[in-house]
Amino acid sequence: MMTLASLPSTAIAGLASAAPKVQPRMAANDEFAYGLPGGANILGEFDPAGFLKGKDKLEVYRLREAETTHGRVAMLASLGFVVQEKFHPLFSGDNGPAIEQIPQLPYWLWIVMTIGIGRAELFRIQKGWAKVNPETGKADSALREGYEPGDLGFDPLGLAPSDPDEFRLMQEKELSHGRLAMIAAAGFLAQEAVSGDTWGTYWGDATF
């Protein structure tokens, strides 16, 4: 079945995390990951691959922006894998792994997806990324000063708590769920690639 992994990341970003109504806590430069949420775990300062080694604050924030975006997409993708085993009105869902069904999409849907993803990514760039450098004529690959990674200013349901500690806890929860979802989505894809069939078929006729 088709998964939701192909959806534009920014189209769903606001659904996964509310925009802050409070001023984010300012961290000292000597804090792990410059004090960003997501480091509170039993392993402590966990960075075995050394991604943060020697990185300045804007670069660390850029990595967090990428992690948050991928986590949000993965949460929808994981949910999509489960839901679409039983509910797939647009696609049959019965002809092999999801990754093999991508070429089966009609051309008009590719056009719609391309335009939608392009507009969504343009919005995200305008919201958080540095402007074009007038000296080089190229866009800087860093976030704007003062931009909080993942904060696209979208909170239609008013979910963001007013208390700074509660808001940080919400950020911690989103990151934890996003990280788990990335592992889950990768597991779904790997399982389908190995078994050659859809996720639900691998476990038998889904009745949930």
UniProtKB/Swiss-Prot annotation:
InterPro entries: Chloro_AB-bd_pln (IPR001344), Chloroa_b-bind (IPR022796). It is found in: Plastid, Chloroplast thylakoid membrane. GO terms for molecular function: chlorophyll binding. The chain crosses the membrane at residues 102-118. GO terms for cellular component: chloroplast thylakoid membrane; light-harvesting complex; photosystem II. Keywords: Chlorophyll, Chloroplast, Chromophore, Light-harvesting polypeptide, Membrane, Photosynthesis, Photosystem II, Plastid, Thylakoid, Transit peptide, Transmembrane, Transmembrane helix. Gene3D superfamilies: Chlorophyll a/b binding protein domain (1.10.3460.10). Belongs to the fucoxanthin chlorophyll protein family. The LHC complex of chromophytic algae is composed of fucoxanthin, chlorophyll A and C bound non-covalently by fucoxanthin chlorophyll proteins (FCPs). The ratio of pigments in this LHC is; fucoxanthin: chlorophyll C: chlorophyll A; (0.6-1): (0.1-0.3): (1). This is Fucoxanthin-chlorophyll a-c binding protein, chloroplastic. It comes from Isochrysis galbana (Marine planktonic alga). The gene is FCP.
